[in-house]
């Protein structure tokens, strides 16, 4: 049963782009996306605070679900919709502070053991990856593939799930067909020849999510 320790998110969050700049956040919100993540890596809090503030303000303006990757203190300080954490960040994060601030929590997983760890934290949603080979970040694990993804989705049948990793426009329909609630994409949009067209096509496949 879906009883998170954090505020819930819709069972289906639809298309979920993960981007590294406020410019991309604004572009995608304007294009109709309603679930996004700002992921800026390896910078100090004070270096990214202005971007976090601007992204959160845009999310509010468009009534969107904007998650901040990693910078949970800034997300709390400026009242983001939610925080996304990698498995390696869970131990070093004050989950009680995130919960007390009323922020949603998403957690990355790569196998059954990490799903167990995520479930113990009772987050708002669980991300499952990486589904396909990806150039976006170095991954210590092998790609899961569609069969493994479908198995994880079945295991988490009543939990909001997000598939991530190497999901292209061509692969998106098969990923959605597993029953996963959301697809997170990076280069499928940011490296597309026509990002507006790619976004529109991905929205057609994955939707904007439930209200």
UniProtKB/Swiss-Prot annotation:
Binding site for 4-amino-2-methyl-5-(diphosphooxymethyl)pyrimidine: 37-41, 69, 108, 137
GO molecular function: magnesium ion binding; metal ion binding; thiamine-phosphate diphosphorylase activity
Reactions the enzyme catalyzes: 2-[(2R,5Z)-2-carboxy-4-methylthiazol-5(2H)-ylidene]ethyl phosphate + 4-amino-2-methyl-5-(diphosphooxymethyl)pyrimidine + 2 H(+) = thiamine phosphate + CO2 + diphosphate; 2-(2-carboxy-4-methylthiazol-5-yl)ethyl phosphate + 4-amino-2-methyl-5-(diphosphooxymethyl)pyrimidine + 2 H(+) = thiamine phosphate + CO2 + diphosphate; 4-methyl-5-(2-phosphooxyethyl)-thiazole + 4-amino-2-methyl-5-(diphosphooxymethyl)pyrimidine + H(+) = thiamine phosphate + diphosphate
GO cellular component terms attached to this protein's record: cytoplasm
Entry-linked NCBIfam families: PRK03512.1, thiE
Listed PANTHER family: THIAMINE-PHOSPHATE PYROPHOSPHORYLASE, THIAMINE-PHOSPHATE SYNTHASE
Name assigned to this protein: Thiamine-phosphate synthase
Native source species: Escherichia coli (strain K12)
